[in-house]
Amino acid sequence: VSQIAGEPGSKDFVEVRLPAAGAYLSVLRTATAGLAARLDFTLDEIEDLRIAVDEACAILLQQAVPGSVLSCVFRLVGDALWVTVSAPTTDGRAPERDTFAWTVLSALAGEVDSSVADDKTVSIALHKKRGAGPGQL
């Protein structure tokens, strides 16, 4: 865990980079659970986040460039966890927001957003605050 300069102790971040392949997603699920536990999330909140991160990664892996790297940045800010997963993609399309997968993400993580960089890297950002019910910030 590293600290972001400027605000000692209030913003920590962890970055995990791994091959963009489903076989490695267990690493991110474990990291998600560990970091959410560090913020004293409930067991239900931890499980919701694990599933949300897994789903976000699954969405990205469908269009990831073969042999590329999946990046996951966790930011711990107060009683909230921000998770951003990103991968270079073949087509640079943002995930459709009217899909079942997006509905699941929104229900489990609270706030969900996506972006596409000029180099066709697609990112999905999740935000969950401790104590917020499903689908709430």
Model-derived segments and spans:
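Bergerat-fold GHKL ATPase/HATPase_c domain
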Residues: V1-I51, L137
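Conserved beta-strand-loop-beta-strand hairpin that lines the nucleotide-binding pocket
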Residues: V1-E15, I59-L137
